Every structure is written in structure tokens, then in C-alpha cells.
């Protein structure tokens, strides 16, 4: 017969959520930084076609 699991404490739940949120915030900041460097032309590690026209 199925037995319900024990409830997770509020502190553990908040800690896990805080870690997840911090990781997401860090990834967003890094992505924004990379995008900004590409758009300003200061990027030295990204290679991309500047004028990529799909209709050709």
C-alpha cells in the first residue's frame, strides 16, 4: 500500500529554492554579458555572420 512521504521542512525548501534562483540569476547575468559583448563588437571568442540574410 502507498505511504505518503514525510513533509519537507520550510527551511530546506527555502534553501533549495534560493540555490536554484541563484544559479538562474548567475546564468542570466552571464548570458546578458555575452550578448552585450557580441553586440558591441568587443567579443573575441565568438564567430558569427554579421549580415545573415535567409532570403538569399
From Swiss-Prot:
It comes from the Eukaryota. GO terms for biological process: translation. The keyword Cytoplasm does not apply. One of its GO terms (cellular component) is large ribosomal subunit. Its main location: plastid. It is found in: Plastid, Chloroplast. Keywords: Chloroplast, Plastid, Ribonucleoprotein, Ribosomal protein. One of its GO terms (molecular function) is structural constituent of ribosome. Belongs to the bacterial ribosomal protein bL32 family. This is Large ribosomal subunit protein bL32c. It comes from Huperzia lucidula. The gene is rpl32.
Amino acid at each position: 500500500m502507498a505511504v505518503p512521504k514525510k513533509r519537507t521542512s520550510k527551511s530546506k525548501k527555502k534553501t533549495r529554492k534560493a540555490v536554484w534562483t541563484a544559479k538562474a540569476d548567475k546564468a542570466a547575468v552571464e548570458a546578458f554579458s555575452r550578448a552585450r559583448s557580441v553586440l558591441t563588437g568587443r567579443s573575441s571568442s565568438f564567430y558569427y555572420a554579421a549580415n545573415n540574410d535567409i532570403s538569399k
